[in-house]
Every structure is written in structure tokens, then in C-alpha cells.
Amino acid sequence: MDATRAPLAAEPAAAPVSWTHRFEAWTASVCVALLRCLPLDAASALGGFLARLIGPRLRVSDLARRNLRAAFPGLSEPRIDGLVRGMWDNLGRVAAEYPHLRHIRVFDPGSRVETRGTEHLDRALAAGRRVILFGGHLGNWEIAALAAAQYGLDIAQIYRAPNNPLIDRFVARLRGGGSELIPKGTIASRRAVAALRRGGHVSLLADQKLNEGLAVPFFDRPAMTAPALALLASRFDCTVLPARVERLRGARFRLTLYPPLDVPRTGERDADIMAMMTAVNATLEGWIRERPEQWFWVHSRWPD
């Protein structure tokens, strides 16, 4: 069954809150309070330093190294170690930048975010088109959704909620509002459909692992990929815009909107979905190959 036409699901019950969840949330709130005492650039630098120091020693870094070896055959071990350190630097900076997100004004003169390609969005909006923005866990990926909200879009952001419901609510507050947050799960398709029906728009990160979905090439290996983007784009005749965030230096960024991807309409539904998601994965792969140290290599994107 087409996921976007599935029967309406009941709202999931709230996840139970454990003492571990409470401790994690308390720890996060203390860290955020301390980071708020620092200017954004200093907080970002501190987060990067601590993550570079600790991250490469964690067991999960072995997964990052395996993924890098598979994605870039022949890459030397010193180069791989350097990319792992760079990845942790970026992740540490992202974490430390959360307390300051609401103060980043993307489109103000002299902003720390350089923007390119907004004309593609303007053309879609002028034509009355609904828009799906997609990106990946690159640079500080929160910048794209932040920019969309500050641009005045009625946008629903599909995201993977943390396992800790207290952390989920805490991070939602740090994001600063301005967009509807839709956690992935049983009701995500229903809420995304509702957003598009009212004339709104959708943003999502399309690079996460699924246990189900379509096996779509990604770095020359099959990777389970959610077809929701293609289904929604086809059903609502959306303009699909790639939205890339790059970290330039420190806590400065470039947000680039690229020309829209073609939405295949051959009449062969399964083939059209596969073609659309192949184009999405190819776009993400190209960005990652250019700046591999800024991607999230510490998750099992491919089957073992």
C-alpha cells in the first residue's frame, strides 16, 4: 500500500520516562546552561575540541572507520583517522551550537550563514508549488530547517526523535520553533500529508538507515532508503529542492539550494520511486564525497 494513503494511525502513546532519561536530561540541561555562558564561536570550538579528544577513542569510531574504508577503497589509514577526527570535530561543534541556534539569523546582513540558490525556492513559491527540501547530516544540518522557518515557510520538519523523550522535548525547544516537528514513525506520513494538503511544505534528512524501505545504491552499495520523499513528491506534485549545509570554518556555514530534481512520471510507479530515490542518494553522495569529514559516519547506513 502507498504509505501516503495508509489508514490513519492512532497517536502513539507517550514513551515512558525512566530515571536514566531524567539523569540524561539533567546532564544535558547543565551542559546547555554552561555553553550558553560562552559566545557561539567559543562554544563551538570547545565542543569540537572535546569531541576530537574523546570521540576517536570510542568504540563507535571503529564503525566510522569501516564505513570510510568501504566508501573510499584505497584510502590510507592516516587519512581515515584524520577524517574520523574531523567528523568528531563537526559533531562536537553541532552539539555545542544547539544552545545558540535561536540566535542565528540566517538572512541578516553579515550573517554567519552564507546563502546561495534561494532563487530556486522563490520560483517554486511564485508558481504556487509545494516544496520538499531534503538534505543530510552534513555541517550543522539544523541550519537548513532554521533558514526555512526564518524565510517564512509553513514547513513541517520530519526528524528522528531521540530515544529519550525528555531530550526530544528539550532539543525541540533549543531549535527555536518556527516549524512543525514530525517524529519519524507510524504517524509521520499522515502528518506530512496534512501539511502538504494545507499548502505547506516539508523538510527532511534523507540519509538515515532504515530496516525497511528500498535498497537504493549509495556509495556503490545497496542502502535501505525510505521512499516517502518520492511518494509525497509524486502525489502532491511537489518541487524537490536539495538543501546542502557546509561548515566553512568554525561556526560559519554555507547553505546552498540546488535546482529542483526531476520527479519521474513514466506511469511505472515502482520504477519512478526507485529513480527518484536513486537521484536523491546520488546527490547526497556527491556532497559527502566533497566533504567526507562533515558527514555522520557513526551509524550503520549499510547492511552488515
List the predicted regions and their residue ranges.
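Non-catalytic C-terminal accessory region of glycerolipid acyltransferases
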Residues: 2-19, 81, 85, 125, ...
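Soluble or luminal CAZymes and related metallo-dependent hydrolases
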Residues: 26, 60, 113, 184, ...
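Membrane-anchoring hydrophobic helices of lipid-metabolizing enzymes
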Residues: 2-135, 168, 177-179
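A conditional alpha-helix N-cap/helix-loop micro-motif detector
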Residues: 111-114, 164, 182-186, 222, ...
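Short amphipathic alpha-helical segments and helix-helix/interface helices
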Residues: 121-122, 145, 171-172, 192-193, ...
